[in-house]
Amino acid sequence: MSGPLSTLNAMNDAASDGESAEQYIASLPEDAQAWMREFTEYVAGHYPTVPYLMFRGRPMFKFEGTYLKGYVMFTAASKHFTAHAIDFDLIEESKPRFPRASFGKGSIKIPYADLDAKQPLREFVDAVMARHGVPRDR
């Protein structure tokens, strides 16, 4: 198997912190699994140079040795999917593109039913990566 899924599987094998990313994703409700797989595969497929690991039991793509230098992390709750980044200003600038979301200082919380938010969320991830000089691979 090749492509983003095989990349994620290889990274899962190397993930630390106990539970693998796949185990974490499999433990989520169905809606949460779908969002989590879609966005972890998006990042792994388009940004294969960014290390994928488990951080505090959640999937994270970390740019450098410390998360303080930049990351994209995803978490799932019962009714919403959350994207996290340390780029607080990008989150603030993105607010108008997510009318049904709620926000934290470093997070965008999107209800699973808000399928229209998926494309702006991909673009947010792309903006975070561009800011940190991460090349997009297709």
Predicted regions and their residues:
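Charge-dense, helix-prone N-terminal extensions
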Residues: M1-R138
